[in-house]
Amino acid sequence: MDKKLAVAMFGQKRLSREGGVEIVVKELCTRMARDGYEVTCFNRGGHHVSGAEYDQSVEYKGVRQKTVPTIDAKGLAAVSSSGFAALCSAFGRYDVVHIHAEGPAFFAWLPKLLGKRVVVTIHGIDWQREKWKSGFGSKYIRQGEKNAVKYADEVIVLSKGVQDYFKETYGRETHFIPNGVNRPQIREASLITDKFGLKKDSYILFLGRLVPEKGIRYLVEAFKNVKTDKKLVIAGGSSDTDSFMEELKDLAKGDDRILFTGFVQGAMLDELYSNAYI
């Protein structure tokens, strides 16, 4: 019988229904496990934004879960958990180590040093994000980017722009593999009507993390200058950028067509998708 390919993954907080990296890792891992691969996810310990339903599960849909030691403090949780995950994957019996995001890729050298094949998925040029503009965080993440270029056997990017960036900056060839999207369950407007007064085709939807690099302030400014009876629904959490959330709300003042829902999930999220005009 052929030996199953053993794959370790880290970089996510934990398997979770919400969160960009977390969704990608969960969908990728469960599909690989379904196809016969041995998949282990090294998850962060301590406080998390979501996914509590997976905390007590050693196995989830065929994916083995391991929680690594984590210094549960701002600025240290991601670094410490990634370091321990890299150590565990380097010394474990894995054929491939798949690292997600630039920060965790700082430790790509460790499994590579012990003979593992290393894949890094770049989910964005993280060191350029506003919350990492200066200090240790930006330098650490940028070094992670460089380590991905140097030590990874293969690098995956999610956009053509990032692919061009790696080619122009480092001369590094990458694989362009955009994220897939699960079709949401189609639902009639009910919860969103009761809570927000929204009906089918009555609103334009923005859904995502509320961070400056997504250009949301331009969306708000542009919408305020449009004559329409549609609402602008901005759905998502602030992701450690509460000051930017307040900036957006100040910018939207005086226009009651602009609605902030906060973090949404489950049936509420499906309804927002199903009934948006755009």
Which stretches of residues belong to each language-model region?
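A conserved mid-protein helix/loop that constitutes part of the nucleotide-sugar donor-binding site
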Residues: I23, S202, F206, V211-N225, ...
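Short, structured helix-loop element that forms part of the nucleotide-activated donor/catalytic region
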Residues: S50-S57, K231-R257, M268
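A short helix/loop element that forms part of the nucleotide-sugar donor recognition site in Leloir-type
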Residues: E53-D55, I186-L198
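An aromatic- and histidine-rich active-site surface loop
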Residues: L76-A90, Y94-H123, W127
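Nucleotide-sugar donor phosphate/pyrophosphate-binding loop at the beta->alpha transition
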Residues: S80, R117, Q128-N147, R187
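Membrane-proximal helix-turn-helix segments that form the acceptor-binding/catalytic region
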Residues: L87-A90, L113, F136-V155
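Acidic donor-binding loop of glycosyltransferase active sites
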Residues: D153, S274-I278
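Carbohydrate-associated surface elements
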Residues: G161, G180
